[in-house]
Amino acid sequence: MEAEVKSLNQASSNTQTGSSMLKVADGAMSNTVDILTSLKEKAIAAANSTYKDSDRAAMQAEFNQYLDQVNDNAMVNYNGINLMNGSYTSATQETTQAYTNTSLAKDTTGATKLTDLADRNGSSLNIASTDNITVSYVKDGKTFNTTYSAGDTTLEDIFNNINTASGDTAFDTSSMATATAEIGTDSSGKKVYTVDGSNGVTVKAGEAGTAGMIAGFSISVTDSAGNKKNTATNALSGFSESIAAANKSDDNALNVQIGTESGQSMNMSIGGISARALGLQGSDGKYISVGTREDAEAAISALDNAINKVLDQQTTIGAYTSRLEYTDKNLTTQSENVTNAKSTLIDADLAKEITQYATNNMLVQATQTMLAQSYKNSTWFLNLLG
């Protein structure tokens, strides 16, 4: 029992240490979310036509400083363990990033003409053939833009045109052939569906794994006079990441021994939150641009995705922390119960022992009295005989 108590106490100590480690990670993520939120505000400002490119250049300098801090946050460590650099993740399978739109009509496919597009309620987006379509996307830290006339082009053509303009097959439109509620499979092997289970239209990255990751993209519709059509723009920009890009990797999750037996452990997968991991920095080290209005609009989408990634990770960390706290309470209760049981078996029952002592003492005293009386009687009898 002594060994069991010590084992339970050590397991409890492990859970407390694990919680402390996760609090360090959570602090870094909270700070990163604050920074990304501030950057989104600046990107929104940079997307305003009232600013000149020289103004945006000053914003870019500030952007770069903030993203330097994001990278510093990703290097936070606990006892020499770099928690947020992406090294400690569970086994994953390679996935191709997917973006799904559930703002357009449920029967929308890649073959639907832009002029025929409707919103979820079936109301026309009123896109005219003379309207201009501007598409911007961020990949490997670089922003690509293209503008063309709507004409009789289709939804699929939006992505094919920007592939042609950028000279890179950034998007794979084969998945847009049909509208479906099933999107694909994520890095853990689970099927992914639209949030409400209704049909949506999905476009995928042109390359599997993180090499093909699109940090974000925006689609803007303007009329021939240059006025933005907000309803159409909002509906077309309703593509959100439904499957994250992931490379195949082995299991390297952090492990906390939370029990006294082999196998009673808890694995914790913690993803990276560096600017590169969030799609905000290219392989050349350069950060995303807000140098032009179009770049800034694409940056807004990229920052939205980055914020969601960190918040998802923070939610996971919160779940790990809650489990460790409940486990610690359970281990503490077990330790107390085993200690009490040990005391019952080993330690003396004081009340019982006092009662037994008093009883034995009375018996001894009675015996001594009887012996003394017997001695007196013997002496008296001998005196009579003498």
Where are these regions (language model features)?
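Amphipathic, heptad-repeat alpha-helical segments used for oligomerization and assembly
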Residues: 306, 313, 317-320, 324, ...
